[in-house]
């Protein structure tokens, strides 16, 4: 059995295959997922697991160089937005690099998410709790 925090075999497989600039999406329970994109569905019930819990575990094994958010999260979900920014700041310190933040419209976010390696669906039931994580390199 793995000792690391990330135990989900599907997520672990996707993370291990990411190359520089490949992306992985962590979304709320309502984010549409195109049929052509790999879906990893973790949602058990409302808010289980939460968006922030999934971000925390995934980023424990993924090198992140950029994050893309829907600009609507700033006004429509400030608590999750602020908590996510705190997590990304802590991740910067742990990784020893800066993580670029980009904001796009929710419509553009949905378009870009369809180009990712996979979309992980959390049980989060709050608006715009979605992030596209862009892979960096560890060297």
From Swiss-Prot:
The protein, known as: D-ribose pyranase
Task performed by this protein: Catalyzes the interconversion of beta-pyran and beta-furan forms of D-ribose.
Native source organism of the sequence: Pectobacterium carotovorum subsp. carotovorum (strain PC1)
Active site, renumbered: 20 (proton donor)
Catalysed reactions, semicolon-separated: beta-D-ribopyranose = beta-D-ribofuranose
BP-aspect Gene Ontology terms: D-ribose catabolic process
Residues binding substrate: 28, 106, 128-130
Subunit structure: Homodecamer.
Protein's gene: rbsD
Keywords: Carbohydrate metabolism, Cytoplasm, Isomerase
Listed pathway(s): Carbohydrate metabolism; D-ribose degradation; D-ribose 5-phosphate from beta-D-ribopyranose: step 1/2
